[in-house]
């Protein structure tokens, strides 16, 4: 069997020569390559199979224009706001997602405020648990950073940041039965779980509105970190329950201070 290509100025043909002289229609085997298949017999008695590429709808996507930017961008161009009060960057960003982001910003700031109050409490001279004060101060700063990250995202998507009221937190965290260290850490664990629940609700809003980018942002920037924080504080609660309110609390405080 011999395979050869024959070229001309207008087209090219691929010939298949079978020296056994078997006549067989192979056109069904090549539906996407050719619509014209010819069988011919030469002087030597050999059969020659040849096909020529022809223009069809199946090859338009390969050889024709599949994307016309100036034509397709026209509808987007018509939607570009002309008012200076409207965002130019906003695209497929629902009002519900925008409102949910603002609510989460408020959650992060409120939790940050509570942690800041706890930092001030444990930093008192008559409490003097500097390790716990350090931990809650860092936690407060972290929640504030989360709020700012959400604010940056809101602006990036073309939304409007609307800060809401922050509730005044408690200033006393003394607990007669548990002790202030354990009570404070249990409160922190509850707050972290609450923040995680709020983030999951925000993710649900993003999924409901088919906002893939927002969903990915929440997953990559918040959810993993939140789960890790819950695990860490859970361990701290378990350790404080084990050591009790006395000398063990002081050692736990030193661990946080030196960590």
Swiss-Prot record:
Region (Extension peptide (EP)) location: 58-90
Binding site for Fe cation 1: 108, 143, 146
EC number: 1.16.3.1
Subcellular locations according to the entry: Plastid, Chloroplast
Superkingdom of this protein's organism: Eukaryota
A cellular component annotation (GO) from this entry: chloroplast envelope
Swiss-Prot/TrEMBL GO biological process terms: flower development; intracellular iron ion homeostasis; iron ion transport; leaf development; photosynthesis; response to iron ion; response to reactive oxygen species
InterPro entries to which the protein is assigned, alphabetical: Ferritin (IPR001519), Ferritin-like (IPR012347), Ferritin-like_diiron (IPR009040), Ferritin-like_SF (IPR009078), Ferritin_CS (IPR014034), Ferritin_DPS_dom (IPR008331)
Entry keywords, A to Z: Chloroplast, Iron, Iron storage, Metal-binding, Oxidoreductase, Plastid, Transit peptide
Predominant location category: plastid
Transit peptide extent on chain: 1-57
Function: Stores iron in a soluble, non-toxic, readily available form. Important for iron homeostasis. Has ferroxidase activity. Iron is taken up in the ferrous form and deposited as ferric hydroxides after oxidation.
Protein name, UniProt field: Ferritin-4, chloroplastic
Naturally occurring in which organism (per UniProt): Arabidopsis thaliana (Mouse-ear cress)
Taxonomic lineage of the native organism: Eukaryota, Viridiplantae, Streptophyta, Embryophyta, Tracheophyta
